[in-house]
Amino acid sequence: SDRTGIDPCNTLIQLNEFDERTRSLIGNRLFNICCLVFNPSSSSEYSQFQFLKPSYRVSRLSQIGSDFCRALLSDVFNLPIRKALGARFDWVFEFSKISDVISNAPYNEVLDILWYTCSWISRYTTAEFSNEMYKALNSLFEEEYVGYRFIAGEIVPITDKSEAVEIEQACHTPFDGARTQLQKALCFLSDREHPDYKNCVKESISAVESVCKVISGNEKAALKDALNGLIANGMNIHG
């Protein structure tokens, strides 16, 4: 508060630049997430067995943090790896490289390394843990007026909470074709340097078309024909 000499929270949407406070909070939250996965003894509330996928609970239990470091140094920082496959990396030590990016790099690199880390963790953890991880980061984004959200594992530019909820729900449609096309649309949108709006819209329309074909029972129908078929059957498509 002003009374204690602390500036009030940022109230401007942060899209192309993140302030120092936001960067610190992102780094802290990501470090806490890594602690839960790579160093579960740091928290008495969680057991690593609870949120690791069953196939990794034995083979990866003692080395998952080291495996992450090896992937991070090679895939993200493009550094030569000079440790044998069985050698261990200290994830807390290597996290300093992530911290440096979050503290000093352009906004898009901050989001890239955040996405990479969460995506890697998501591959080894249960859906429940991954959902809670993304929810925690989205809450931080909302609190700090960051104009991005994690949606279906991608970071996309969006500021309205209701829009984020709608897109997230759409990405979990039971229709396989539509779900795949919406995921592609999000990937096109999530490219922060060169977002491909044209193909994003194209895939989104294709997703709508896929659902309409299934509902109308006509797999060969074009979007217009499928919509007309739904209307003829009494469906209100305008809300």
Q: Where on the chain are the PLM-derived regions?
A:
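Long, charged low-complexity segments
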Residues: 1-32, 38, 152, 156-159, ...
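Generic low-complexity, intrinsically disordered sequence content enriched
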Residues: 16-19, 77, 186
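Charge-dense, low-complexity intrinsically disordered segments
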Residues: 17-20, 24, 104, 172, ...
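Internal, Lys/Arg-enriched amphipathic helical interaction segments that engage polyanionic partners
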Residues: 27, 32-180
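Amphipathic, oligomerization/interface secondary-structure segments
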Residues: 170-239
